[in-house]
């Protein structure tokens, strides 16, 4: 490791870069109802800003991953940071919802660069137990982001408005850009990929022909659909239907983030990843059905919140184990498999997000919960049994 880049420096910088996803998606959630009034549009159109950012986060991973392998880590990362700053300025000064939605797509692409390249830098700089330790610490920093981001947004929404939230994101982008200028190149020229772009795309096809990999990626994708249906609908349900303030909503959002994180930690208590994944999928299906009935009947908040906490906990059981199962199935193409896994999951989130804004939000959300949970469970049916995990 270069002497100019200490472990503490790398931990903070890479941790914040990997947290781009939650900051880009979660921080402005409490402002969605206010943005509906500001742009004089529907909730579904405002949620398109979430959709396009998810699509950008998905597509950008497929772009920045190969770019960083061919041209090094530093230049693509600096490019992503400049793009993030520019797209955030476009969000702030958007005069109509179409401009805002377009800017959010660019912001998602820029954020994906930080997510993908930060993992690559850690792999370049460290090896063995040091790499495992660094990735665990980065994961801890990243795990705090979904809790902190909506609280910051909810606390400041009433005082600075939605443009103020994006001004904070702009300042974060400037700080990270300054930090990236200090980052030394971690991939020397002699280690960079020399393969043609056609070979890279052919490796995507090879991975997609792996039935076991596809099964677990689909399972994760539909589980992400449940997650982003919740993310897109919760501001309107909690603030619009139940009458919560932006700050009260952010506290509930943070509590629900704990459900996902604690489930991921609890999943290691299962005997193998397959059991954790199957238990989580069955739990998702049961809680999704109960939550749909609750939303349809218009039950009280605590019934809604209790079932939602259970739904998110069940979903969290699948995340870590499904990732391990998918990556284990495509070990020979780990880089490609990782990029595609992230891209497909964010794509599912982007597709699902606007669906909860069609018609009655309560009924639409319940329907999306059931369909995604059912498809997540059915996806496991196409996965062939694997001897490494099939033991009781």
Regions found by a protein language model. Name each.
Residues 2-3, 185-216:
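Juxtamembrane intracellular "pre-TM" segments in multi-pass secondary transporters
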Residues 40, 72, 93-99, 110, ...:
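Helix-breaking motifs and short loop linkers at transmembrane-helix boundaries and internal kinks
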Residues 59-98:
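Conserved MFS/SLC helix-loop-helix module at the cytosolic interface between two early adjacent transmembrane helices
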Residues 83-90, 98-106, 302-308:
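Paired small-residue
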Residues 99, 129, 136-181:
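Helix-loop-helix hairpin linking two adjacent transmembrane segments in secondary transporters
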Residues 103-144:
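Cytoplasmic helix-loop-helix junction between adjacent transmembrane helices
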Residues 277-321:
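C-terminal transmembrane helical hairpin of 12-TM major facilitator-type secondary transporters
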Residues 325-361, 368-369:
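A late C-terminal transmembrane helix in Major Facilitator Superfamily
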């Amino acid at each position: 490791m270069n002497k100019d880049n200490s472990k503490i420096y790398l931990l903070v910088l890479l941790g914040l870069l990997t947290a781009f996803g939650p900051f880009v998606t979660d921080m402005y959630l409490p402002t969605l109802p206010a943005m509906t009034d500001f742009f004089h549009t529907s909730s579904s159109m405002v949620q398109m800003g979430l959709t396009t950012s998810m699509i950008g986060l998905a597509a950008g991973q497929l772009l920045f991953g190969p770019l960083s392998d061919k041209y090094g880590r530093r230049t693509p990362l600096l490019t992503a940071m400049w793009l993030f700053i520019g797209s955030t300025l476009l969000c702030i000064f958007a005069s109509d919802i179409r401009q805002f939605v377009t800017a959010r797509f660019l912001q998602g692409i820029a954020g994906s660069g930080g997510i993908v390249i930060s993992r690559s830098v850690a792999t370049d700089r460290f090896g063995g137990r040091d790499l495992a330790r660094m990735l665990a610490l980065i994961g801890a920093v990243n795990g705090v982001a979904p809790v902190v981001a909506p609280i910051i947004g909810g606390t400041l929404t009433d005082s600075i408005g939605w443009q103020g939230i994006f001004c904070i994101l702009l300042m974060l982008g400037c700080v990270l850009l300054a930090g990236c200028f200090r980052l030394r190149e971690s991939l020397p020229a002699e280690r960079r990929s020399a393969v043609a772009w056609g070979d890279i795309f052919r490796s995507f096809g090879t991975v997609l022909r792996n039935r076991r990999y596809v099964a677990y990626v689909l399972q994760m994708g539909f589980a992400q659909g449940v997650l982003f249906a919740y993310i897109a609908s919760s501001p309107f349900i909690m603030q619009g239907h139940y009458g919560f303030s932006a700050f009260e909503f952010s506290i509930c959002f943070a509590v629900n983030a704990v459900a996902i994180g604690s489930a991921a930690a609890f999943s290691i208590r299962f005997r193998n990843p397959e059991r954790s994944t199957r238990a989580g999928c069955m739990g998702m299906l049961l809680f999704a059905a109960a939550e749909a009935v609750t939303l349809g009947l218009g039950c009280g908040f605590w019934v809604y919140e209790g079932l939602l906490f259970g739904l998110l906990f069940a979903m969290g059981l699948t995340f870590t184990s499904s990732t391990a199962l998918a990556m284990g199935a495509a070990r020979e193409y780990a880089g490609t498999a990782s990029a595609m896994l992230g891209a497909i999951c964010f794509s599912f989130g982007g597709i699902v997000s606007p669906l909860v804004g069609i018609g009655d939000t309560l009924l639409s959300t319940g329907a999306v919960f059931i369909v995604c949970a059912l498809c997540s469970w059915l996806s496991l049916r196409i996965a062939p049994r694997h001897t490494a995990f099939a033991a009781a």
